[in-house]
Amino acid sequence: MAALLRAVRRFRGKAVWERPLHGLWCCSGQEDPKRWVGSSSPISKEKLPNAETEKFWMFYRFDAIRTFGFLSRLKLAQTALTVVALPPGYYLYSQGLLTLNTVCLMSGISGFALTMLCWMSYFLRRLVGILYLNESGTMLRVAHLNFWGWRQDTYCPMADVIPLTETKDRPQEMFVRIQRYSGKQTFYVTLRYGRILDRERFTQVFGVHQMLK
């Protein structure tokens, strides 16, 4: 996984995995706050109260997330092709045009592809691409991938986010968990390969940590 993370960093774009959110201002603390941050990829998001007037500030970004989204969609297409090929394979076997070994091989490849798809989807749907904090400091917006490899935004009240200082995760680890007191979905942040754009807001969300020293 570390080698894959190092490889995908080479494919970072100038504006990676960012997009307008239907009237929601989004700006990264180091860029022009009046500039829309956007992309053409489909997006799914939960409804946020006062979304039309709320302003969010980016404080963390993992540039390689767009590449992982592409890999996720590629894996989904590859799995679909292997599964779709099974019925014709069984038919050809029934007609004596394929051997049993060939059909077993096709079934094995399809099963392996489905297993890998489930594993990749489970991990990638929890890998954080961008973190935002609203201006009032009460809402954390987590941009991550959905099952189809497109961006999805999840909103977490700050009161529900467990600071890193209260967890057993170490900053030297490849992935650090974003956990919630409510026990809802856990996300993963890679501090080794991601970038903290605003340390003040990062500390506000996750607490003072030795990685910021």
UniProtKB/Swiss-Prot annotation:
Compartments in which it is found: Mitochondrion inner membrane
Tell me the residue ranges located in the Mitochondrial matrix compartment per UniProt: 1-79, 124-213
Query: According to the UniProt topology, which residue ranges lie Mitochondrial intermembrane?
Result: 101-102
Q: Name one Pfam family in it.
A: TMEM70
Task: Provide the topology term for how it sits in the membrane.
Answer: Multi-pass membrane protein
Regions crossing the membrane: 80-100, 103-123
Q: Which UniProt keywords apply?
A: Membrane, Mitochondrion, Mitochondrion inner membrane, Transmembrane, Transmembrane helix
Q: What are its GO cellular component terms?
A: mitochondrial inner membrane; mitochondrion
**Listed GO biological process terms:** mitochondrial respiratory chain complex I assembly
According to the record, the signal peptide region is none
Q: What does the subunit section of this Swiss-Prot or TrEMBL entry state?
A: Part of the mitochondrial complex I assembly/MCIA complex that comprises at least the core subunits TMEM126B, NDUFAF1, ECSIT and ACAD9 and complement subunits such as COA1 and TMEM186. Interacts with MT-ND3.
| Task of the protein | As part of the MCIA complex, required for efficient assembly of the mitochondrial complex I.
For this chain, the family text in UniProt reads: Belongs to the TMEM186 family.
PANTHER family the UniProt entry points to: TRANSMEMBRANE PROTEIN 186
The protein in question is named: Transmembrane protein 186
